[in-house]
């Protein structure tokens, strides 16, 4: 009877094994296995199923209870990164990746190193695969919980902008332009270069104290070909990107030559960086302008801008807007003067003579000189010589390829001499291999070193534009001071003349009141040599009356009293303008000096550090590969 029970029990266990996929435990042991009942959340309550083994004689059939978790954990998936151990039911419910896992490609653990497959230090899957909870950039203002509200740093990691393709679009009448297909989250939109220009122009007017990232300069293919070294050269596009831009993901749907391709990829890189940097700016993302730019419903960006009352009401010049809120520009701001080049030179001379705002001006003068020198070192130093080095390596690659072909032909001619032909073949293969390695190196230097350096130069230019904006506001303030001092001097002079005229009129009125006849004889001059004759004063009065009649015939001249009133109004307006510009200048100076420029410096340090790391890695890998190639040649020569 016991054997029959064992058979039935084994059959039951086999049936459970087929249903659950668990192996049958060996005889002679007893244990409890907790089977996970997967619920909607991926975690179920354990269901105990006793499994009894065959117990030997003399045993008391005591059951040893042992709870074994069989739920599929994150560590059991070979495509998931290793998670924490020691899970409990409550801990499993708190794992962020348990609800919806995003498979991770194991190939992404390694970069294209051509030889060694060096592992990358990538971020955790939970961080890199986090998706945005809303399609709107300013969704942070919505009613979302604190745990679900994505921060700017999280959006930077999870929501990246990519330009998927660049294609030629015809406008008709033989005209065409390059359109860029932008992907953000789950939507795509098509924009042209002039749309990016318009967006940046609006951002500069909306955020005059913020460093707006640069976009590539507008130039024709011909001009761009002249501005780059080796414009006719073709460079191999690297399989790995640099920074946040991977050019291998962008496709050019057009028949273009080498110069066109480099210009388009240059624009793709800088425009992608431009949009991604805007996404990380907390001040800009509080508005909806980036959302509007990436909205597929806004097919024509220029029509959208023209139809917006906010954009159309912005002042044309950032020098005539309220820097704290350009959409709320006051009447005083709109009437502020705009300094020109001549006034700048004049005011610089006067300011240096009078030593006005010496400390503040000196501080920003030093900052401007430092940033100008920084930009010059990047543009005419590192960037310039790296372009030259890239061209040299490109020419060397061509020479290696040609000399490899020559050695191959020579080996074919010396086929009857087996040993010599073999040595020539090894040399041919070595030069060909070095040429291939150089081609990869040149492509990486051009796209992943020179292009980021060029972007750094443009960023330095944008920083200097911000410093220049502060300088123009300073000159504007000096212009108002100069104009105010001039108006005050005019008012004092006019009041002095009015007082003199009043004295003359008073003397004439006094003489007329004494007698109806006017004594034209010279009165006794007892007032000293500086006194004026009575006749002279009288004739001055007649001349004044005659000039008034004459002027009334030709044109109506403003009388001194009215001119004095107008001057007082102008002085009042200039005083208000001076107060506004001084307050603006103080705010602008603090924001630029204490916020924007330090932030720019930190970002540039990080970017340049990454560029230098890439540079040393590329050169090291090429040197290692080239060394192995020539070591192989030496081994063959030693055994020959």
From Swiss-Prot:
Residues 1-18, 135-153 have a biased composition (Polar residues). One of its GO terms (cellular component) is endosome membrane. The modification Phosphoserine is found at residues 361, 363. InterPro entries: AH/BAR_dom_sf, PX_dom, PX_dom_sf, PX_Snx41/Atg20, Sorting_Nexin_Autophagy. Its main location: membrane. A 1,2-diacyl-sn-glycero-3-phospho-(1D-myo-inositol-3-phosphate) binds at residues 192, 194, 218, 267. One of its GO terms (biological process) is protein transport. Residues 475-512, 562-593 form a coiled coil. Keywords: Acetylation, Autophagy, Coiled coil, Endosome, Lipid-binding, Membrane, Phosphoprotein, Protein transport, Transport. Residues 140-301 form the PX domain. Signal peptide: none annotated. Residues 1-63, 135-155 are annotated as: Disordered. The keyword ATP-binding does not apply. Forms a complex with SNX4 and ATG17. Required for cytoplasm to vacuole transport (Cvt), pexophagy and mitophagy. Also involved in endoplasmic reticulum-specific autophagic process and is essential for the survival of cells subjected to severe ER stress. Functions in protein retrieval from the endocytic pathway. Required for proper sorting of the v-SNARE protein SNC1. This is Autophagy-related protein 20. It comes from Saccharomyces cerevisiae (strain YJM789) (Baker's yeast).
